[in-house]
Amino acid sequence: MFTGINHTRKEDFSVVWDLGRRCTYACSYCGPHHSNKTSPLVEIDKLKHTLDGIVKYSQLMDLYRKEPLKLDIAYTGGEPTIHPAFFEFVRYAKETYPFIRSNITTNGCYSEKKCREIMDCVSSTTLSYHTEGTPEQKKLVVANIKLMHESGYNFRINHMFHKDYFDECIELAEWFDELGITYTSRPIGDSNNKSDLLDGTAHEYTPKQLEYFKNQWTQKSKPKPKAPSGVMHMLTTEKPKAKTSLETIGRPCCNGKCLSVKVDDEWTKSFLV
């Protein structure tokens, strides 16, 4: 079933479609509410019928608009590609409704053939990289990242930084930087939630690891200065101020994002979402 429809934007009609909880991974920090091996799978006919209904609904809304809506569908899970009918379904979506812009959130752990099918049928990909995978799994994911990059496909990476594999995560981030691949360094869970720390769905990072996050986000949030004519590179020696927790340094993640919320007619900063 789909989990959300966003029709607040002026020109876009966006659907977040949860295709099920099942996943090919079993990450220690991912609770059963995010992934499992037993949740039921929706039949292909029901998937197609639901998609047909979404398109009809958006077209009905277009009758009362000067300009038609742009229909976006984001497939998520679990791992969407574990659904046995997934590739048949996205092929149907592309061939029947070529105007739909689609995205998939995936772990990238599948064959080259499936990766090429995704590139052909899905407009863009958000790939979550997890270092808890086996060496064989991670080798497969890296190969697919390289394939998407070399193919000029539209994708980005959510790089999940595991506290116990931090050096490996840094090495991979440096590889992304070398290739010019877009990625976000993401802490795992909410380190300010004690129950999440106890059950392992959140990681507590060392000061050195937090410093790495701070430097990453500071660099990514600031526009790069333009070099004067004839200058190839510009270097800066400015050091950002030290901070010691995810809350104080800010966190670009869906589960702990710094937001401004209005409370009693006052705007205040909220850490927990």
Regions found by a protein language model. Give the residues of each.
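Canonical Radical SAM [4Fe-4S] cluster-binding loop centered on the CxxxCxxC motif
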Residues: F2-H49
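Radical SAM enzyme core and accessory elements
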Residues: M1-R9, D264-T268, V273
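Active-site beta-strand/loop signature of hydrolases that rely on acidic residues for catalysis
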Residues: G77-G78
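Radical SAM enzyme [4Fe-4S]-AdoMet core and its adjacent flexible, acidic
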Residues: S124, S128-D264
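Radical SAM/AdoMet-radical enzyme domain recognition
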Residues: L51-K56, L60-A74, H83-F176, T182-Y183
